[in-house]
Amino acid sequence: MALRENYREQLLDAAVLVVARDGLDHATTKAIAAEVAYNEVYIYRNFGNKEDLLQAAFNRADIGFVQNVMKHIDVMDEADRSLEERCHALWDPVWAFSVDKPDIVRFYLRYYYSVQYLTSAHELHHRNYQQLQARLSRYFRSSRDSWFLMAHVFETILSFCSHILSGELENTPAVSDEIFQLIFRTLQPYMLS
């Protein structure tokens, strides 16, 4: 069983690398299997088909992001800090996590904005974020607002990560702070102090 799980993890890693490097259109089962020197049959045995493999890779990346936020979210309950300080203390590790994984971010960007995401992973993505949304809703005036604002923050992070990955922006503390300020000023009117 451990060997099968090892195959699965290696194939997930390979799918991320191939999509990040070559795009979804070139992420064939042959290219993914070749990345780890496996026969394509291992994709079908472990995932059923390429689409299920890509969805599983997306799900793993999605859950990793949510877990990272959840790992640091307790800072939002520190009453001795201002709202801005608490939000900034949450921002720093979330931003670092996002920009420190360029292949995962490239894969995520390509999959998240694809038709395949809309047809097979959209609901999964919403389920992955339910726990985070429930936790974040306590910091907003309305739980309805928290869904929209969480999506806004998430997509803003993705957008700025893409600018950094393309070389348009440099990942510096000053740029991170500018992005934080942009997001914070947008969220502040909707947040509880």
Predicted regions and their residues:
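N-terminal intrinsically disordered/low-complexity leader segments
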Residues: M1-N6, M191-S193
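Short, leucine-enriched amphipathic alpha-helices that occur as contiguous helical runs
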Residues: R4, R8-V16, K50, H152
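Helix-turn-helix
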Residues: Q10, V18-D52, A56
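Short helix-capping/turn signature of helix-turn-helix
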Residues: L24, F47, R110-Q116
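Hydrophobic alpha-helical connector segments
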Residues: A56, K71-D100, V153
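Short, basic, alpha-helical segments at the C-terminal edge of helix-turn-helix-like DNA-binding modules
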Residues: N59-V66
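Amphipathic alpha-helical packing segments from all-alpha helical-bundle domains
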Residues: V66-K71, D100, V115-A151
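Hydrophobic/aromatic-rich alpha-helical bundle segments in the mid-to-C-terminal region
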Residues: R106-R110, H126, R138-F184, Y190
